[in-house]
Regions:
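A glycine-rich phosphate-binding loop feature that marks nucleotide/adenosyl-phosphate handling sites
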Residues: 13-17, 71-77, 127-133, 166-171
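Charged, low-complexity surface patches
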Residues: 104, 141-142
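Alpha-helix boundary/interfacial micro-motifs
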Residues: 20-21, 27-29, 91-92, 136, ...
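Conserved alpha/beta catalytic core and glycan-binding cleft of carbohydrate-active enzymes
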Residues: 129-134, 142-175
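Generic preference for hydrophobic/aromatic residues in regular secondary structure cores
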Residues: 27, 43-45, 125-128, 169-170
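Hydrophobic faces of well-ordered beta-strands that scaffold small-molecule active sites
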Residues: 7-11, 70-72, 122-124, 137-141, ...
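Substrate-binding cleft of carbohydrate-active enzyme catalytic domains
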Residues: 1-120
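Generic recognition of flexible, low-complexity loop/linker segments
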Residues: 59-61, 111, 126-128, 148-150
C-alpha cells in the first residue's frame, strides 16, 4: 500500500485445491482424490465440513490482508467427481439445483455471501461470471478466447481485471 500496490491473495477453490486435499482427504468427495480427466479433484461442496474449512481458510486470509478484495479462484473445476458423489447429488437436490455446473455456481455464491458478511469482496476468474454474483464482485478475465465474459461482467455491474493469458502469463512463450 505504501507504494500504491496491494498484494491480493488468491486461494483457488473449489478446484486447484489438491495441496489441501492431499493433507485433508476428507475435503474431497469420498475416495475421489487425485487427477480427473483434465484437472485435479475439487473439494466436495456436498459436505458441510468442507464448506466450514473453506470459510476458516478465508477467515485467516481476511485477518492477514487488510484489503477490500480477496481472490477465490473458481476456475478449471473438474466436476466429474460431483456427478458420482452422493453428497454432492444430495446438495444439488436439497438446494433445488439441476446440475454440477449449478452446484459450482451455488458454492461461489455461498462463498461470496461469506465474504460480504466479513466485509470483503470476492474476485473470481472469468469462469464464475455466470454464477450469479453481486455487483460487489470483480472478475479476472484471463481466457482471451472467452469474449463474452467481459461484457457479461460489466452488464452485471462487476469490475473486470483484464489479464489475458497470452500477454500476462510469464511462461506463455515457453509453455
Amino acid at each position: 500500500a505504501q507504494r500504491g500496490i496491494d498484494v491480493i491473495p488468491e486461494i483457488d477453490m473449489p478446484g486447484h485445491f489438491l495441496a489441501a486435499i492431499t493433507q485433508y482427504p476428507d475435503l474431497a468427495c469420498d475416495g475421489l482424490i487425485g487427477w480427473g480427466e483434465t484437472f485435479s479433484s475439487p473439494i466436495c461442496p456436498g459436505k458441510d465440513t468442507t464448506l466450514e474449512f473453506c470459510q476458516d481458510v478465508f477467515k485467516e486470509i481476511f485477518d492477514l490482508f487488510p484489503y477490500e478484495y480477496v481472490h477465490m479462484g473458481g476456475d478449471e473445476v473438474e466436476k466429474n467427481n460431483w456427478k458420482k458423489c452422493p453428497r454432492c447429488q444430495k446438495r444439488i437436490r436439497t438446494e433445488g439445483l439441476k446440475s454440477v455446473e449449478d452446484l459450482q455456481a451455488w458454492f461461489v455464491r455461498d462463498m461470496e455471501k461469506f465474504f460480504l458478511a466479513n466485509g470483503k469482496k470476492l474476485i473470481g476468474w472469468d469462469e464464475v461470471v455466470a454464477d450469479g454474483l453481486t455487483s460487489d464482485a470483480a472478475i479476472t478475465w484471463w481466457r482471451s478466447w472467452s469474449k463474452e465474459a467481459v461484457p457479461m461482467a460489466t452488464s452485471q455491474g462487476q469490475r473486470v481485471i483484464a489479464c489475458p493469458n497470452e500477454y500476462f502469463y510469464f511462461d506463455y512463450a515457453q509453455d
